[in-house]
Amino acid sequence: MGKLMAEKEIDRKVAIILATDVVNYSKHMEANESETVKNLRACELILQKFIKKHDGRLFNSGGDSFFIEFPSAVEAVECAVAFQKDINKRNNSDKITVPLEFRIGISMGDVIKEKENLLGDGVNVAARLEALA
């Protein structure tokens, strides 16, 4: 009976998740830590602009990785494409000494809402797809 009650208390839903992180982040940090962090923060501002534009919600981040929930798959894909275009343009600028490239994975699946965070297979699949990108 206790297990059944615990299951009912879990807040589940279907969500569209975008996972992204920096390619070769550890190597960038090893080579030039301060410049890498500076560039990562600038790229994060670009990402936040597109998250807002496409009605997304950043629910988890750590180091160079970001997890975002979207109301639709179309919004997630449009956000990813716009972000990659802006990052590519930024990386081709003469001012950038440490260009950062981002991998992105998008999935739709069941998640568990825990406070403001999302957990579960839907998040894990997005992270696995991102790692394959």
Identify the residue ranges that each predicted region occupies.
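Catalytic NTP-binding/metal-coordinating core of nucleotidyl cyclase/transferase enzymes
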Residues: G2-C79, D86
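Catalytic beta-strand-to-alpha-helix segment of the class III nucleotidyl cyclase homology domain
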Residues: K8, L45, F67-A133
